[in-house]
Amino acid sequence: IISSVMANDLSFTPNVTTEFRYFPESPAYDGQFEYFQPSIYFGGEGRWVSKDRKKRVRFEPFLRLDLQDDERTHFDIRELSYLQRFNDFDLLIGNAQIFWGVAESRNVVDVINQFDEVENSDETDKLGQPLFRFGKFTDIGRFEIYYLPYFRERTFPGKDGRQRGPLIDDLDN
């Protein structure tokens, strides 16, 4: 049972989407499916913020069911994190997507999260990364220290997937 104090600051926005990809060209490699790729996405965003706004919990589940590419059918917790703010520093613990990187001429190179290649090859979809983050505000800016307890493997399309290259990535072996 959620108390009325907590319920006032608790929200969840579900998202269910059907997707139909159409590829007008014939497959480039043997084993790829033909022209249509239907799938269903289930996800959402849950948030809880304390009344003093010093505590926050975020939850973003992700489930894709693809009818043709088994590697694209997957579940991930993109975010399940707890943030505690103190006077001039904060602590983030959990699974999170961090938008932080090094600027290059073309774009920002993300150095924390792996990209979810089975979703898109444009490097916009990220996998959640287990981490601890300590952040401190100073007069000259903000400083952050990250601890990543382990490395998430990048995901790739399977042999049936249309957005794969000539070599098949077999990460199961």
Where are the regions a protein language model picked out?
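Surface-exposed beta-loop-beta
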Residues: 162-173
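Surface-exposed strand-loop-strand hairpins of Gram-negative outer-membrane beta-barrel proteins
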Residues: 20-39
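Outer-membrane beta-barrel translocator/receptor signature
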Residues: 37-40, 53-55
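Transmembrane beta-strand segments of Gram-negative outer membrane beta-barrel proteins
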Residues: 8-26, 55-59
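Cleavable N-terminal export/targeting peptides
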Residues: 1-9, 160
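Outer membrane beta-barrel
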Residues: 47-163
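Histidine-anchored nucleotide/phosphate-binding helix
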Residues: 41-46
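Residue-level preference for beta-strand/loop junctions
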Residues: 8, 36-38, 74, 126
